[in-house]
Amino acid sequence: MEMILITGMSGSGKSVALHALEDAGYYCVDNLPPELLSSFVALKRPHNAPKLAIAMDVRSATSLPLVPEQLRELKAQGMAVQSLFLDANTDTLVRRFSETRRLHPLSRIDATDQHRALVDAIELERNLLGDMREQAHVIDTSMIRAAQLQGYVKSLLQNPSRQLTLVFESFAFKRGVPLDADYVFDVRMLPNPHYEADLRHQTGLDQPVADFLKAHSEVDDMFRHIEQFLSHWLQALVRDHRSYVTVAVGCTGGQHRSVYLVEALAAAFGKDWPTLKRHRELEAG
């Protein structure tokens, strides 16, 4: 029996992720009170529900501290448990709430008619969910569409052995560091294909760009140093019971250098480890 727990910021896409899991055959429950988690799982065991997906949000904030111990107990009983935390930057969340005209769950102050400003409600939610975020695999949805999020969540399910999965992500520093990054590597000092007229409108996925970068020894040096660093620490991450580790590689525009290195790293580590790739700026269009 396995279970995926979904938490995260309001407006970050938890419902989209839950729908993706439902499409993948999971028995899904939204907004389950944390104090009912263990009893709900016990209720489903006799009914042969092998895959459960449960979403919790900030409306259960007072009970969320109960969750880590319950998850440890479920793992001790032999259940495969994963925790996903969906996040997005504040500007994105403000825009999403403005577009949908929905009220943030923490907008109302207690039982009064007074309301918090939207930004204040979002920051309060971040503080309340901080511990849950620390214990989960974080997915930054700031720059991805609903269909892309569904596809990404489904791709996380492709590791039945529960071996540590490496997620390699390219990004542009000018658009911010991904919120879900465990390690960030800055490659802006490397030769930039952007300044080559015939390469400017291509990406790190294209062979001419790859050939240009391969011709510079410092690019290979950067690749080898990142590879050596990760290889040195992977077993320690396994001992720490990590399910996912996100390695973000950033350049100025997220089109050439970071994309090339993410492809190279995923190919190298993919020989021995489950790997996923994301090119944030390319996927954003």
Swiss-Prot record:
Lineage: Bacteria, Pseudomonadati, Pseudomonadota, Betaproteobacteria, Burkholderiales
Homology family: Belongs to the RapZ-like family.
InterPro entries for this protein: P-loop_NTPase, RapZ-like, RapZ-like_N, RapZ_C
Positions bound to GTP: 57-60
Pfam families associated with the record: PapZ_C, RapZ-like_N
Annotated TM spans: none
Protein name: Nucleotide-binding protein Pnap_0906
Residues at which ATP binds: 8-15
Record's keyword terms, sorted: ATP-binding, GTP-binding, Nucleotide-binding
